[in-house]
């Protein structure tokens, strides 16, 4: 019996040792897996971050270049068209000088006054031209709604359809911008 007890004790001890070893192995495997997770955190994708940072930098540079270009163009336009307001105010003076020059007289005094008016008009027109003001050609030209304002349309045997036959008020451009369209009569 004693042998049986000893065998049972041995078996129990062996079983206990095997269980302890198994638990130790299980714990050790779990610890290793956890240790691996702790020791090797998910490596950040530095290449992707670098590529994203470079792309962001390129976008910012492009945005800044566009900003500088827009500001430069706006500054150029402000300088180019800075005289537009005063030119618009001076154009009625040119019209009035043209009307004054249409007066016909045999009187010598009136003729000398008209000569003076002609000189003033010529000087004013030269000054406007130096500022970039250009008279829009009208009579005999094809009607262009960007340059001309049709006031009258009449059938004409002398002109083709869509051709300006008369000008009621001169039109002007400042550089490439229309500041006043020509008021015209157009052939149908």
Swiss-Prot record:
Q: What CDD domains does its record include?
A: GrpE
- Any GO BP annotation: protein folding
Q: Which UniProt keywords apply?
A: Chaperone, Cytoplasm, Stress response
Alphabetized Pfam families for the sequence:
GrpE
Disordered, as annotated region: 1-26
Q: Does the keyword Zinc-finger apply?
A: no
- Subunit relationships: Homodimer.
Family of the protein in this entry? Belongs to the GrpE family.
| UniProt name for this protein | Protein GrpE
């Amino acid at each position: 019996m004693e042998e049986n007890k000893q065998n049972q004790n041995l078996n129990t001890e062996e079983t206990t040792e095997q269980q302890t070893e198994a638990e130790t192995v299980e714990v050790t495997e779990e610890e290793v897996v956890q240790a691996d997770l702790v020791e090797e955190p998910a490596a950040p994708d530095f290449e992707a971050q670098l590529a994203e940072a470079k792309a962001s930098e390129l976008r910012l540079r492009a945005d800044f270049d566009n900003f500088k270009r827009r500001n430069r163009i706006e500054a150029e336009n402000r300088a180019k068209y800075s005289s537009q307001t005063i030119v618009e105010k001076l154009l009625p003076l040119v019209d009035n000088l043209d009307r004054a020059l249409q007066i016909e007289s045999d009187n010598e005094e009136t003729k000398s006054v008209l000569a003076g008016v002609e000189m003033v008009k010529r000087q004013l027109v030269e000054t406007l031209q130096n500022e970039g003001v250009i008279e829009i050609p009208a009579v005999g030209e094809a009607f262009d709604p960007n340059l001309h304002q049709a006031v009258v349309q009449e059938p004409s045997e002398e002109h083709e359809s869509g051709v300006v036959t008369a000008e009621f008020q001169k039109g002007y451009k400042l550089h490439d911008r229309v500041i006043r369209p020509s008021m015209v009569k157009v052939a149908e």
